[in-house]
């Protein structure tokens, strides 16, 4: 079985969010499990800035997408995912993908639709024996639409099965109906049984309806998106396709997130004593009061309400009355950036606010915190809670999506559980849960050590995830063949 993994972002070449981490890791583990897999992505401008492309192999030049009206030629460059033998093909054209922000909204439909058609041309020219295409989110969702319209009679492409992985259903790709002509797609697709959605073209809807199989990135999220609360208007068609909808939990790359070998952290972590060394080193590094008994709480993520940053901001004044420290790393909504920066002036030894994204600092925070805060409004999977547990940091979460699937409530009676959580999206519930965690950290030291050990024993490696994706590829292929 040969699989094409198609993504608009792939780490480390181009990264805007968690999708890039998945796309940069999962194919390696699928390859290690014995399947033939390769990756396709656009050649974004920053790749040329950050890599010596003379080391990339130019495998095709002068290709033109078959269906799309934008007939600018493209070249196909070939390299490998870091530390692996997984081939990655880059689609390079001089007229597109030159923004610093890869999701720059200017001409985003042109960029994504051109990429979808060009990816199919690349597959046909470079890997004609491909069996399955795994697409990701709305940016690649026109691939199955092209396959079931323009390429329906193509001798090579018509045999390929498709899987759509939804990483966040809140992003759907809504455009005026004229874009169908630009993409070279038939106008009959603009109807309620295809891509039409309240007078707009909904690209993700097309991916859902035209793919053989759909999956999302946690079992709970697969159920949630079939409800009005979480479905963002697509719950109806997801219910219709519920038999073809699966949830597979993301993993994390243990070769990168390794508490024994991570070059970014202060000390290797094998024991709780090692954990405390990282904590006091982090306190010193950030200019906080150096004291291993203070509860160090951290948040790493985008400062948007989806991540629960509004709840966090509402409880900060009360939270800071306690013997705690708070570390934040991330960027986002300006009002939250400004609010947290202002707090540092009031509590300089209790708060460290870092309005940036810094991989080195992120690893240090995961390794040095006592509590990792993730009170998301919704969370398809979430990686931060897995990273934190990998380094023995206890997650406090809202039980939604992948957070519900990965964090179990600590029970002092049987000593099982990896964290603390709440259900209702309310600041009072968050504050109560945090105070409970702080109490266990400061007053129940034996229990806290148990939770630390439970976190360190959790297995979120991609080996398990890869096996489930391989099973899903086989299901998609059987469905395509009519079995």
From Swiss-Prot:
The keyword Glycosyltransferase applies. Keywords: Glycogen biosynthesis, Glycosyltransferase, Transferase. Its EC number is 2.4.1.21. Gene3D superfamilies: Glycogen Phosphorylase B (3.40.50.2000). ADP-alpha-D-glucose binds at residue 15. GO terms for biological process: glycogen biosynthetic process. Pathway: Glycan biosynthesis; glycogen biosynthesis. It catalyses: [(1->4)-alpha-D-glucosyl](n) + ADP-alpha-D-glucose = [(1->4)-alpha-D-glucosyl](n+1) + ADP + H(+). It is an enzyme of class 2 (transferase). Coiled coil: none annotated. One of its GO terms (molecular function) is alpha-1,4-glucan glucosyltransferase (UDP-glucose donor) activity. The keyword Membrane does not apply. Synthesizes alpha-1,4-glucan chains using ADP-glucose. Belongs to the glycosyltransferase 1 family. Bacterial/plant glycogen synthase subfamily. NCBIfam families: glgA (TIGR02095). PANTHER family: ALPHA AMYLASE DOMAIN-CONTAINING PROTEIN, GRANULE-BOUND STARCH SYNTHASE 1, CHLOROPLASTIC/AMYLOPLASTIC. This is Glycogen synthase. The gene is glgA.
């Amino acid at each position: 079985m040969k699989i094409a993994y198609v993504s608009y972002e792939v780490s480390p070449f181009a990264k805007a969010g968690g999708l890039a981490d998945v796309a940069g890791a999962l194919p390696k583990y699928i390859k290690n499990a014995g399947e033939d897999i390769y990756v396709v992505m656009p050649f974004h401008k920053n790749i040329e800035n950050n890599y010596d492309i003379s080391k990339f192999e130019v495998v095709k030049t002068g290709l033109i997408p078959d269906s799309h009206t934008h007939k600018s030629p493209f070249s196909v460059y070939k390299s490998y995912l870091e530390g692996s033998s997984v081939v990655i093909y880059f689609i390079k054209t001089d007229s597109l993908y030159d923004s610093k922000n890869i999701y720059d909204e200017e001409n985003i439909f042109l960029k994504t639709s051109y990429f979808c058609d060009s990816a199919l041309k690349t597959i046909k020219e470079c890997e004609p024996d491909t069996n399955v295409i795994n697409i990701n989110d709305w940016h690649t969702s026109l691939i199955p639409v092209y396959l079931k319209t323009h390429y329906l009679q193509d001798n090579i492409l018509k045999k390929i099965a498709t899987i759509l992985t939804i990483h966040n259903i809140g992003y759907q790709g809504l455009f005026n109906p004229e874009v169908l002509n630009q993409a070279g797609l038939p106008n009959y697709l603009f109807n309620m049984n295809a891509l039409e959605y309240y007078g707009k073209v909904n690209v993700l809807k097309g991916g859902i309806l035209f793919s053989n199989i759909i999956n999302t990135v946690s079992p709970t999220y697969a159920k949630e998106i079939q409800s009005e609360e979480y479905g963002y208007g697509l719950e109806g068609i997801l219910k219709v396709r519920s038999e073809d909808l699966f949830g597979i939990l993301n993993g994390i790359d243990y070769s990168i997130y390794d508490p024994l070998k991570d070059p970014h952290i202060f000390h290797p972590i094998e024991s709780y004593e090692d954990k405390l060394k990282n904590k006091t080193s982090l306190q010193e590094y950030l200019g906080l009061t150096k004291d291993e008994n203070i509860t160090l709480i951290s948040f790493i993520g985008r400062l948007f309400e989806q991540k629960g940053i509004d709840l966090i901001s509402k409880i900060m004044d009360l939270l800071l009355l306690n013997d705690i420290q708070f570390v934040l790393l991330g960027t986002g909504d300006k009002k939250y950036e400004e609010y947290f920066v202002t707090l540092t002036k009031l509590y300089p030894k209790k708060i460290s606010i870092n309005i940036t994204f810094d991989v080195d600092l992120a690893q240090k925070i995961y390794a040095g915190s006592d509590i990792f805060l993730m009170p998301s409004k919704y969370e398809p999977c979430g990686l931060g809670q897995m990273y934190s547990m990998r380094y023995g940091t206890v997650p406090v979460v809202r039980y939604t999506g992948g957070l519900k699937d990965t964090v179990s409530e600590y029970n002092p009676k049987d000593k099982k559980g990896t964290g603390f959580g709440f259900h209702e999206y309310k600041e009072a519930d968050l504050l109560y849960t945090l105070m409970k965690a702080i109490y266990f950290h400061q007053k129940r030291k034996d229990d806290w050590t148990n939770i630390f050990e439970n976190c360190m024993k959790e297995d979120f490696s991609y080996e398990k995830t890869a096996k489930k994706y391989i099973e899903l590829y086989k299901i998609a292929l059987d469905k395509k063949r009519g079995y």
